[in-house]
Design a protein with these regions (language model features):
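Non-catalytic structural scaffold of enzyme domains
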Residues: 2-108
Length: 108
């Protein structure tokens, strides 16, 4: 699984530990790619700015992770849904925000 999120999420073990315990290998972006994702999140997306170049950068990072074995891309940042939609993506995507909502609705 490709894990894309803030540097805290990608460098930390919160998601990675859960996935590892379930037998899922987690692939994270290279350090320079993590810096770029962090910049996109905090300088653009959190301010409502969605640039085509940033979408392209995001998709490039996702593709790099997929080539390393991350067959599904986990959007583990609430803002990444502004860049890619799990229902229209060219590759398998799980948006953690949408997954939380689905789980809460299923619980109801």
């Amino acid at each position: 699984m490709s894990l894309l999120g803030t540097k805290y999420i990608m460098e930390g073990d919160f998601f990675i530990e859960y996935f590892s315990n379930a037998g899922i290998t987690t692939i994270v972006p290279e350090p320079d790619e993590q810096v770029e994702l962090q910049r996109i999140i905090y300088e653009e997306l959190t301010r409502g700015i969605v640039l085509a170049d940033s979408r392209t950068s995001f998709l490039t990072v996702a593709e790099h992770c997929r080539r390393k074995g991350g067959d599904v891309v986990g959007l583990c940042c609430t803002e990444f849904g502004l860049l890619v939609d799990e229902s229209t993506s060219a590759f398998p995507v799980i948006d953690s925000t949408r997954a939380h909502v689905r789980a809460l609705l299923a619980w109801r």
